[in-house]
């Protein structure tokens, strides 16, 4: 019998990857292709959706070429993606009517601010679990419909379709046959009612978004459609798994029990907690979202987004030139002889959860004449751990659950100094996945379950393994003293609002 595999498409903010996994969950081949971001005006971030589609096709082809695997050996396809990014396209031609507006983009900020001033924050939070922000898809849809002449009327007639990137890729792969999204991606649009599991008519009416342009919303593990044979080298293969990137990482880490938490240390940090089958509405500025839905059940999650994590290490390397390679930061931190009196608050683009202070800017505090390069590097690494504690502590406050263990992935999870300090400052064990490809793995798991490639989550548990475990060993008095210093550093950073004179002219 011909051996079968699962293909995961991992569509990120700067590149697309296609990864082929075998039945043991091992990566057989992968291919990556970067695509450009466009910045038409300050604060605007856009993609060309067709460049993303081309990157999907080319990486699929290259993964097949590298592995020697045939398209008809793929049992199912899982898609994971950058969330919130918004595409609107012509149903008849498949051509986007405007560039994709990216999650990072602030060009729709005025629409979000008007929703706030008009008093809709509470309504939107209760229905969607989200705060009102330009980050999410709703304001982006409204902006494109306003920007492109005739778009509103065409959307009302059903001539235009909206999708987040998962929807766009699926629609293209199926040759326009399937217009669908999943619960996790829908829960990031700010127009999806996470209690009713449907688009919310009140919010659609508020923003004048026609329901006719919206995709069907489905669970994360089922057959949504099949590839058009002309897009998949003569083969019709089921697209059978779909999840936003952070939720895919939660599933890839098999954080399937309420109270389990994962942190992905990427450019930023995304801390996601499984809260079980009932949504926990945060009273402390965390996002309530959908974690995943399989076997007819929906698991909800709390999420805290930290804007700067791995990018702080890039800052040490590229801007400050304190390290030659990012990996050098571990040895430098270990070489520091400071008493941890230096604090770096990397608020380069403001502070994320739980502070949500867009005006804050970075700071270095506690320096003396004796402060050296290693001390600054160490304090920068420690800032990632402190910010994680900020979010984890807030999750504990919202849920009443004592978090004893954190599962981690992402590039900075390879830094053993950081992982040990993270365990110490949280007073929780840290488990690093043996396979750090947890986002793609999550998409593969969801796809494989739907087509019987894997039977159930018990079988997945046989595949998943912890690579390294870090136990806390810091005395409580020291831990709390260090964290009190961090809280002071945050307050000092929030106070400083001065801007250069020229910016205020």
Swiss-Prot record:
A Pfam family per the record? FGGY_N
SUPFAM superfamilies, per the entry: Actin-like ATPase domain
Q: InterPro entries, alphabetically?
A: ATPase_NBD, Carb_kinase_FGGY, Carb_kinase_FGGY_CS, FGGY_C, FGGY_N, Glycerol_kin
Means of activity regulation: Activated by phosphorylation and inhibited by fructose 1,6-bisphosphate (FBP).
Concerning Gene3D superfamilies, the annotation shows: 3.30.420.40
Subunit-structure text = Homotetramer and homodimer (in equilibrium).
Summary of the function given for this chain in its UniProt record:
Key enzyme in the regulation of glycerol uptake and metabolism. Catalyzes the phosphorylation of glycerol to yield sn-glycerol 3-phosphate.
Name the record gives this protein? Glycerol kinase
Q: Which organism is it from?
A: Latilactobacillus sakei subsp. sakei (strain 23K)
Q: What is the lineage of its organism?
A: Bacteria, Bacillati, Bacillota, Bacilli, Lactobacillales
